[in-house]
Amino acid sequence: MNILLTGASRGIGAATLATLTDAGHRVVGHSTTGAGALLAADFSDPAAPRALWDEALAELGHIAVLVNNAGVFEAIADDSDDAAWHAAWSRTLAINLQASADLSRLALAHFRTRGGGRIVNVASRAAYRGDSPQHWHYAASKAGMIAMTKSIARGYAADNILAFAVCPGFTMTGMAEEYLGSRGGEKLLADIPLGRVADASEIAETIRWLASDAPASATGAVIDVNGASYVR
């Protein structure tokens, strides 16, 4: 299958790119700067999602699956000045949620011409459990992804357009390592019944399954991969 994967330069995205490629899929990956073979798009620019979609479509010819993985995890204190607070919220929502919505809208239009397709959104445990006092905006953006996923699943199933989400907990990526180090890794690990954080390859395999093998009746499903640190 032809797949567009955002946020493919590191962590979960890089692992997913490798997993999907190894499974025989044709994948166009994205990063902010477009290092190597990755296509460049800075999602803080409102025009970037459409430009990326058009470039990926030109390269692949058609797209069967969109994986929205790109995101930022940046702190903002609740006592920041108004300008900094609003800037942080605007940036996080633009990159984590608006860009995913824009790409999903373009994917829906394309999928309708091809008899269907799949969207896999990479959200977070924070969508349900919340996050730190410095990361309201991050949790809110990921909760928005869940609501968007369910809306797409319900609204477009009749067109054979399926939507799924993955909610990782702590995963061995640069963002998680920084977070664990800043907040006391041992204490946080004690809150994970499995006793360890997830490996990026575990999230990647979940994404691969949703992108290619999950049954159609599972559309709208949100898969938790968090070592039972949050159970819904």
Question: Where on the chain are the PLM-derived regions?
Answer:
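Short, small/polar-rich loop/turn modules that mediate ligand/substrate recognition or access, typified
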Residues: 157-162, 218-220
